[in-house]
Amino acid sequence: MNPMTELGLRFVRRPGPGGRAANLAAFGATAVVALLVTFLIAGSLGLSQRSERIGWRSADKADPATAIGSLNLDDDQRVDGHRLSVLDLAILRPNELAPPPGLDHTPKPGEVFVSPEVAKRWSSLAKQYGVDKPTGVITDKGLSSPEEFIIIRGVQTISADQHPQYVSSWNEKVWDSRMLGLLIAVAFGIILVLFPILSLVGQAAGVAAKRREHRLAALRLAGATRTQVLWLSAVEQAVLAAAGAVVGLVGYTVLSPLIAQIPLGGGRWYVGDITVQWWTVLVVLVAVPVLSVISALIGLGRVSITPLGVVRGQTRKGLSVLRIGLLVIGPVMLAYYGMKAAVLPLLIAVGFAALAVRVVGPWAVQLVGKAMAKAANGPVTLLAGRRLVDDPKGAFRPVAALVLSGFVTGFISVFMPSGEDDPTFNDMRIGVALLLSLVFLTVAASTAAGAVGTALDQAAPARALRRSGVPLSVIERAARVAAVVPVVGVGLPVVGFGALCGLALSGGKMITQGSSGVLLLLGQVVAGLVLVTVAGAAGAPVLRKASAN
């Protein structure tokens, strides 16, 4: 075995002082990343599978001269408070057809096939449809959800004034309109949650990387080559990330029955639709460790190039004000392409806006830190301000996911309609709640890992301050202030920036009705402050112990 590989595995087994907490934080954060990535992939594929089973109902581009059937859909009826869809189907080529998905034979005029939920309530519908008993029950192969309410009724013909749709195949690759809308919404959701997830990946890698930075710098100064140092770090991070990915996959599998209860797209999911496939497992087991290793190696760039700078504690160079120019690109693109309803450019625009927040964040933290240091009237404010100025990237990294969640909250606060009976609005509300849940889980994991990482990062300066006579209480208070200030000073403007991007996309229209948007924004602020406060309290013992030696 390669000596550096063996040494890396030994460091995982025996991480040294402070290493166990760092490894556990990195492991837990990576497990959350794997669970979220699996959920997003499986959910997107599940929508595709749901659409494949019912896509033929939306087919309307077939040539009437060659079509196998004509359709007319009425989805405005109700049964026991549930929306009921009635699909009239006229078969144009009865001798050439296999039955539609989920039906045991092609419906003849007067025959009625119903979903299981409708079959349970048929006694109240029999008189209306003139059939005492349904011809058959549609199986799960022909339904988008076990809770779908639909009647497929065979008719002789559909008149032209009903504007029939024409279908050329039951297996035609046509997206159901509702599933397609959900998939587009999921794409926007993925873009919005992507950067918090990437921040969590970076945080997971950074916690362990920061702990090993001085150790690897010492190895570098002792004669280890740059390649050896990077390989050692990659091995250590890959083992932690792979273990976290496995736990995340197992966690998703265990939670699948609960996830299937989410009533999106007209009802709950079939568990089989969101069950992970072998290639999904492979993607997660490869992608999560690779991203984690890359993040760790980027964080150790200083070690491989200037190890003496790490040991001497050299500060990083200042950040350019040019970063703020990125804030303009996203809103302008959203305003321009929002009018054109071009999905891909809009996804890119949302990504640019979120990226701008991530890139501008450290610069804004440094700006706030300079103002704090200049206006400091005590040691706590001065120490906190200098911390933000000296290492703005390090100060922003633990709260990056939280700040980005503010962008997400501000963005979606514009899109919270209150139409109770509209299925699209209902899907939107559930989607917003689901997106916020994913973001909050990401933020909680990132903040927890960041608390440990920040404590270990500040161990050396805190140790020096304690030796020079600075009280531990002052050091801990300064650390808490340095954690809260980026959330307030940067996070609140980012919430407004997110709302601005949402308004740019909607053409300046506020889709949200009532006070739900304001309550959502207030909830974001309160949740953010609570998370940072709890994280600071959790990180204090780690800082106290790490700076004691």
Predicted features and spans:
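Hydrophobic alpha-helical segments
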Residues: 239-352
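Hydrophobic multi-pass inner-membrane translocation pores used for secretion
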Residues: 1-37, 64-66, 115, 159-170, ...
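Small-residue-rich transmembrane alpha-helices
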Residues: 202-205, 241-266, 282-305, 487-512, ...
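Extracytoplasmic/periplasmic regions of membrane proteins
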Residues: 7-12, 39-190, 196, 408, ...
